[in-house]
C-alpha cells in the first residue's frame, strides 16, 4: 500500500470545481490523493473530517482543512498556497 500524500482532495468525477482544483494542484506539480465520494462511506468520512461541509471538492493539506476550490484559489491569489505545499 502506498503512503498517503500530504494532500487529499475529496471529489466526484462530474464536478467542475473538483477538476479546477486538481488542475491547479497539477500546475503546482504536487502529488495528491483523490478520494471519490460517490462511495457513501467515503462521503460520510469527508463530511465528518470537513466539519459538516457536504460540497466537493474538500481539500486537506496535511491535517489542515483548506476547504473547496474557491478557498484553494484564494490562497493561491494571496501567495499563501506555496508555503502550505512545501
Regions found by a protein language model. Name each.
Residues 31-43:
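Thiol-based oxidoreductase modules, predominantly thioredoxin-like and allied folds used
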Residues 43, 53-56, 78:
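A general structural signal for well-ordered alpha-helical segments in protein cores
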Residues 2-31:
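Local sequence-structure signature of Cys/Sec-based thiol-disulfide redox active-site neighborhoods
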Residues 50-51, 85:
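A broad structural signal for alpha-helix termini and local helix breaks/kinks
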Residues 16, 41, 54, 67:
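Short alpha-helical
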Amino acid at each position: 500500500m502506498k503512503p498517503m500524500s500530504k494532500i487529499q482532495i475529496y471529489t466526484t468525477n462530474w464536478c467542475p470545481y473538483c477538476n479546477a482544483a486538481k488542475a491547479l494542484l497539477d500546475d503546482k506539480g504536487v502529488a495528491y490523493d483523490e478520494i471519490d465520494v460517490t462511495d457513501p462511506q467515503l462521503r460520510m468520512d469527508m463530511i465528518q473530517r470537513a466539519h459538516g461541509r457536504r460540497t466537493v471538492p474538500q481539500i486537506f493539506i496535511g491535517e489542515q482543512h483548506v476547504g473547496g476550490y474557491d478557498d484553494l484559489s484564494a490562497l493561491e491569489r494571496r501567495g499563501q498556497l506555496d508555503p502550505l505545499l512545501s
